[in-house]
Amino acid sequence: MQNMNYYYDFSGQKFNHPLSLSINSFDRKVFSRQTSLELSYVLKGSYEVITEHISHSLTEQELAVIAPDEIHILKKLQPESVILTIHIDFERIPENMLGSCKNLFHTILCTPVSNAALLRSLKEEIRRLLMVLFNGDSADGTDLFALNEIMMKILCIAKKQRNTPFEQLPVDSTHHENYVRAIQFIDRHYQEDIHLTDIAK
């Protein structure tokens, strides 16, 4: 049974908008890959971010930017943990508005110690986004001009980040080698019908 004490969902997909935002305490069990840029901001507790190159714990008020098409999982480390997740889906943005987004974005972790300036900038846009979403009423609805402006600002902030040298990527988990093997297997067989027993082999 999922904990619904902390739950909010704005699904832009319902009206073909690229941006979605959710707040929940769900416990993710599977790796995922999306065409969207993902921002995951820890509101309470802690989560482990796992990709092919990263396995690192994030605590309250820390953030992960997950690049499009990156196979990843965010594992809840404490029962009462709560996370805010934003997705900006490039398949719902006309290409003539952005051009090619391939390799423009990189997965990066933002903490008060690492990428602190980026963390501050993205936190401010998250704050503005929540104000727009929560202040929309049933008569006027959400201010789409403000929503679009914030969405584009988030993309501009996130795309300016440079590659981090491989040896500087955070790898904390003792299980990282197993995670890498699982991610690489999923990547090779992504279009096939695979099961956990296949990955375990």
What is each model feature region?
Residues M1-A64, D69-E70, K76-Q78, K102-L104:
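Generic protein-terminus/edge-of-domain signal
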Residues I50, E95-M97:
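Residues that scaffold the ATP/ADP-binding catalytic core of kinase and kinase-like folds
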Residues Q61, T197-K201:
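Append "Primarily bacterial transcriptional regulators
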Residues V65, L129, D143-L147:
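Hydrophobic, helix-rich cores of sensory/ligand-binding and other regulatory modules
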Residues D69-I93, S100:
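Ligand-binding loop in jelly-roll beta-barrel domains
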Residues L109-S121, F134-D198:
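Short, Lys/Arg-enriched, Trp-marked, Pro/Gly-tolerant hinge/linker segments that flank
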Residues S121-R128:
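Short, well-ordered alpha-helical segments
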